[in-house]
Amino acid sequence: MKTDYKVGELIYDANIYDRLNTFLSDLQFYKKWLPTNKEARILELCCGTGRLTIPIAQEGYNICGVDYTPSMLEQAKWKATEAGLEINFIEADIRTLDLQEKFDFIFIPFNSIHHLYRNEDLFKALACVRNHLK
């Protein structure tokens, strides 16, 4: 039996996610790895509601966010607009990602990588990361 692991809508409600994930204590960890050139293209995979995407964009970085869950992206877009930011948020599966562009830096925050349940899914996602790096 072949199983589609699209569980995003079952596990995450954007409003609940934002209420449970109000912390930004990990932001400094991610920021220390960002390129020094703020014009560098940054891609955040599994960006959710923009918990990290938005503060990084507020620092002047050129960042794009990808997520699988429409409700998360809707919330991220709303929050970015409220913050006066123009961020490109894209609905896509990181296992089959094909944005037709390259990035200087790509990261997957928090525990999102654990949603890739099978090794083949992890390898597909990592191959997509490789294909999108400059």
Predicted features along the sequence, with ranges:
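Conserved class I S-adenosyl-L-methionine
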Residues: M1-G48
